[in-house]
Amino acid sequence: MNGYLLDTNVIRDMIRNPSGKVATHIGQIDPRAICTSVVVAAELRYGCARKGSEKLLARVESLLAIIPVLPLDVPADAEYGGIRAELEIAGQPIGANELLIAAHACALGLTLVTDNTKVFSRIRGLAIENWLDR
């Protein structure tokens, strides 16, 4: 499967800046190539619950209704195990959600679009792009 899996920080930017860099980039590619992970959706919904903002939740739900949210499934578990072991052996562990998102992208052969390139660049074989490039 070719395409792009949008990370939490990228979707958050789309919510804050609907006409920003990410939206512009999406406008230049096939929108069917865009998706996100259920882990990202969970992080976004957690952020809304923590803020207690119905308005923000409505914006998140509206965007997630447009962007396909992919379920986490086999073979992401095998990818997760390999990635986690490799990073821990190297003394460079990352957060649990980041691991799941990376494993999801790797398992599906997707490029992870993230502003968190410092963390995700440690993962061998994970294709990453930063559409925010600050």
Would you name each region that the model predicts?
Residues V10-I11, V40, A76, I101, ...:
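Alpha-helix capping/helix-boundary segments
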Residues M1-T36, Y46-S62, I89, R134:
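Short, well-structured N-terminal submotif of metal-dependent ribonuclease cores
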Residues D7-T8, V22, L44, Y80, ...:
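Generic structural signal for small/hydrophobic residues in well-ordered secondary structure
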Residues I11-R12, A42-R45, L70, S121, ...:
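Nucleotide phosphate-binding site architecture
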Residues G20, T111, K118:
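Flexible glycine-rich beta->alpha loop in the catalytic core of nucleotide-sugar glycosyltransferases
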Residues N2, A58, I67-D115:
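Active-site neighborhoods of divalent-metal-dependent phosphate/nucleic-acid chemistry enzymes
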